[in-house]
Amino acid sequence: MNIHEYQAKALLKGYGAPVAEGVAILKAEEAEAAAKSLPGPLYVVKSQIHAGGRGKGKFKELSPEAKGGVRLAKSIEDVVANAKEMLGNTLVTAQTGEAGKQVNRLYIEDGADIDRELYCSLLVDRSVGKVAFVVSTEGGMDIEAVAHDTPEKIQTIAIDPETGVTAADVAKISAALKLEGAAAEDAKSLFPLLYRAFNEKDMSLLEINPLIVMKNGHLRVLDAKMSFDGNALFRHDDVRALRDETEEDAKEIEASKWDLAYVALDGNIGCMVNGAGLAMATMDIIKLYGKEPANFCDVGGGAGKEKVAAAFKIITADPKVEGILVNIFGGIMKCDVIAEGVIAAVKEVGLKVPLVVRLEGTNVELGKKILNESGLAITAADDLDDAAKKIVAAING
C-alpha cells in the first residue's frame, strides 16, 4: 500500500524527522489560507498523486509550456494561481503512463534554501536478508538513471537487525553522503529514526528524494515516499486509515476484497492462474509468442467457484483485454471447481473475447467434461505451450 507525500511526512515528523511545515488542500479556495499559515516567503505547490516524476510531468489539459506538478511560488498570489491551475487536471509523468492521474489534492509547503540534494532510501535487501540504506550524493533526480549511468555513486549499507543502526552505521552513511558539521550531527538522530519507522510500520520502501542539506548546514526531508507491506496492515490501523483508493486501480481494489493476488499490466491477454510461479511462467510464454499479459492474477490454491468467478469478472472488466488464458494445475485446487467458476462468470458477464483454458491435475477429466458440455465458445489446450499458441493465434485472427 502506498500513501501520499504529505502523509508520509506527517508520519516521519511524528518520529522526529526534520520536515518543512505544510498544509494539504482539496480545493483551490483553501490555498490562500494554507499559504498564510506558513512562514514563507517561498512556497512549493506539490501535486499529490501516487507516482514519481511529478516535477517533470505535464498536465494534459494545459499547454506544453505550462509548469509541471511541483511548482515554486514566490507569493501567496502565486500559490493560489497555481492551485487553480493544477487541481482537477490530469498529470502525466514517466510513471503514470499516458493516461496520467487526476490531481485531487495539493500539498502547500514552506520553501527551503537548498545547498545540496541527496538520495536516501530504506528497503529489504534480499541478497543479505537485512534492511539496508541505499544512499547517493546524486539526489533530486531519477535514481534509476543514476544506477544505470553511474552505479559507483550509489552505496548500500545493510543494517544488522540485532543491533539496529549503530554509530558505525551512521558514520558509513554520513561518509557516503559526504556530510559534515551540522548535517553530520543531524544524521546521528535522523538515520536511526528512519530505520525505526521502517521497521515499526512494516514498510517495504521508504524513499527520501531529495534529502537536502540546507544553506544553514542542517538536513531536511524534502520529499518522502512510503510503501507498506499489505500483509502486515492488520497490525496498523493508523496506516490503513491513510489509504486513498482513488489512487489505486479499481480492479486491484476489487481483487483485494476476494484475497486475489492481482496486478494490472499493460498488455492485452488476461491471465488467470493458480500459483505465483505458474503465473510468472504463463506471462513469460505469452511474451515468448509476441504478446503481452494484461495482468498477473493468482487465484491461490484453495479458491472456490465464487472466487474463480470473481477473478474472471475482474479480468474481463479490463477494456484492454482481447483474449483470456486460464492456466490451472490442480493440486489443492480442483479442475472441476475452476471449470464451474469460469462457466458461471461467462454466463453472468458474457464472453466477447477468445478464451483458452488449460487444465491439468485433480479432477481434470471432470473439469474438461464440464467445459465441453457448457455449450460456450471455450478453446481447450493440452499444455502450456499449446495454450499460449492458441490464445495468440485467436487474437491475431
Swiss-Prot record:
Keyword hit for S-adenosyl-L-methionine: no
Binding site for Mg(2+): N209, D223
Protein's GO biological process: succinyl-CoA metabolic process; tricarboxylic acid cycle
Catalysed transformations (reactions): succinate + ATP + CoA = succinyl-CoA + ADP + phosphate; GTP + succinate + CoA = succinyl-CoA + GDP + phosphate
Domain ATP-grasp, chain residue ranges per copy: 9-254
This enzyme's EC code(s): 6.2.1.5
Keyword Cell division: no
Family: Belongs to the succinate/malate CoA ligase beta subunit family.
Function: Succinyl-CoA synthetase functions in the citric acid cycle (TCA), coupling the hydrolysis of succinyl-CoA to the synthesis of either ATP or GTP and thus represents the only step of substrate-level phosphorylation in the TCA. The beta subunit provides nucleotide specificity of the enzyme and binds the substrate succinate, while the binding sites for coenzyme A and phosphate are found in the alpha subunit.
Name of the protein described by the UniProt record: Succinate--CoA ligase [ADP-forming] subunit beta
Native species: Rhizobium etli (strain ATCC 51251 / DSM 11541 / JCM 21823 / NBRC 15573 / CFN 42)
